[in-house]
Structure formats: structure tokens, C-alpha cells
């Protein structure tokens, strides 16, 4: 799949320049971005379930980050706790809508961010249904606690929020570029 995704410049450089997400990166590449987010989240959750069980915590040097296992039965910030099946159904609907939007997005940044967010959303949904803390009990495995940020979170949350941020910034940037006045032809400035 990597050979399919290659082009003359990196995806990051194209995203920074607001390039159109055309033929240079076929659908397989964008789905690969989502799969990368999903698999990396699953791997880190598997590690956390093994390394942080029985209340074990790891303090990262500097004291700002602490790794600890938390079962989150709700959505973001614990919203919806107690209604795990509703949270799962709503999550699935939002992931499908986000995937459709990401597939139709017009810029590299929008597609990149959209597919990262889809992978993150799927990571939490799969965790909610399959994993031991979830295991059809509806919980998501959270394991990263930052002292200045209230909820404990996981890599899927980072992919989801970071992806949405990249997509929104890309959309705003491309919108701004489309609205910018075009200099008259022959104007050397």
C-alpha cells in the first residue's frame, strides 16, 4: 500500500500548502490513515491493559503525565455514562457521517484530519464493544492522565480531536484561499 501512496511530495507538505486531495493519494491511502489510527490505538490500549492492571500507575518524569487505567462508560468527558448502548449507536452514526465527509473532502488537510478522526472514533467504538474493560459492558479504556487536563484519555481521543482540528483548520484555510481576491492577469505586483 505504501507504493500506492507515494507522490512527488509528502502528504504533510501538501496539507500545509492546502493542496487538493486528488488522484495523488487514492482511497486506499486515506483508508490506510484511518487504519493506522485504529491499530496504533488498539496496540497502546493492549499495552495499557497489561502494564497498568491492578491499579499500577506510571508517573512520567516531570510529573505532568501519569499513566493509569480508567474505564470510561460514557463518551467524551464521561457524558452519557449509563447509556452505553446509546453512546455506541450514536458513535457509529457519527463515525459513518465523518467517513462520508472525509471521503468527499476537497483538500489534503481535510481528508487527513477526517480519516485520523474516523480511525480514532473506530478505536473507541471497537474498545467499547470488544475489550476486557468494554467487553460488551460499554466502557472505553482510558490510560493517559495529564495534570492540567481533567479527563483521562487514550490515543484514539488524540487521533479524534487532533484529526478534527486538522480537518477544520484545513477547511478554514482552503475557504480563505478560495475567497482571496485573484490579482489581474499581467499584474507583476
Language-model features, listed with the residues they occupy:
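Alpha-helical transmembrane bundles and membrane-interface segments of multipass inner-membrane proteins
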Residues: 1-189
Amino acid at each position: 500500500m505504501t507504493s500506492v501512496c507515494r507522490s512527488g511530495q509528502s502528504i504533510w507538505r501538501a496539507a500545509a500548502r492546502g493542496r487538493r486531495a486528488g488522484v495523488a493519494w487514492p482511497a486506499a491511502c486515506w483508508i490506510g490513515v484511518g487504519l493506522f489510527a485504529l491499530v496504533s490505538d488498539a496496540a497502546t490500549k493492549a499495552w495499557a491493559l497489561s502494564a497498568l492492571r491492578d491499579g499500577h500507575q506510571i508517573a512520567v518524569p516531570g510529573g505532568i503525565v501519569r499513566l493509569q487505567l480508567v474505564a470510561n462508560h460514557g463518551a467524551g468527558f464521561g457524558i452519557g455514562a449509563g447509556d452505553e448502548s446509546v453512546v455506541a449507536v450514536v458513535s457509529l452514526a457519527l463515525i459513518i457521517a465523518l467517513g462520508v465527509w472525509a471521503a468527499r473532502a476537497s483538500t489534503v488537510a481535510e481528508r487527513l484530519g477526517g480519516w485520523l478522526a474516523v480511525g480514532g472514533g473506530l478505536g473507541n467504538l471497537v474498545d467499547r464493544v470488544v475489550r476486557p474493560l468494554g467487553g460488551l459492558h460499554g466502557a472505553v479504556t482510558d490510560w493517559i492522565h495529564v495534570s492540567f487536563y481533567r479527563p483521562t484519555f487514550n490515543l484514539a481521543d488524540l487521533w479524534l480531536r487532533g484529526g478534527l482540528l486538522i480537518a477544520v483548520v484545513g477547511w478554514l484555510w482552503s475557504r480563505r484561499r478560495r475567497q482571496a481576491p485573484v490579482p489581474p492577469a499581467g499584474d507583476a505586483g
